[in-house]
């Protein structure tokens, strides 16, 4: 009896070890406590990485610029970031944009203190001209703010831009050390709820489309296309599930945001869902399709590339076709099992 038990135990261990060996490590980078990063948390809680044979190793960064810089040391393989750092990442490190995390045009904005908001309501241009705006340079918030300046007939040279991390900006607004800031959600909701700040103009109101980017190191994607496709399938499935289970998703969001030190009301969490369109596999493929001209995603990233050239962040305007690719989304679509996995809301 003892012998049979030992044999059974040995078989179980062998099977477990064999299964563990089938899991391929993949290094995933993102910025914590952000709406578009929620799928990574949901997928981990649901055990979906294992289902496609991946073992994720996560690394987080406070903003996109340090995140893309870390790719030079191969600190990560795939991930999500803002569209502005995604373009910068291509130019500096050969990073590919392989999909869109969400439309965050309403989630990047020019924010003002209560006092400044009152001035802005009377005369936006006068309230902004000559003022200092604290923001994180080369970010989606930077893009949104400069789009808003154009809306009111102003140029970058009409204001003073002061570079700060988002945590510093929250502190500055809360202590009345700044009146104007470029921010992204959920930091926007934090200062609205805790510092009485107001959104003066979102990227959407400024006429800008601000997509988030799913990214991969160029060399990693070329050598491991199936791993990249599996990564995308897991990410897309998480969005499908979140869309079908918003109440449970908000509960998970509360935990995910708290881990990154963010505490906002449930109403603000719901606003994340209501104002940030996300895209399933079919929509991703349609947005990235190049028939006889540039795709919709090409147009979005071309606008961002022009902005970055105008601000001096880039020496020339890169060709979008050199870094935006639907190759890996197509791999998901072409694999029946991956396609079914990616489109399931269960």
Where does each model-flagged region fall?
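Sec/Tat signal peptide C-region and signal peptidase I cleavage site
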Residues: 15-20
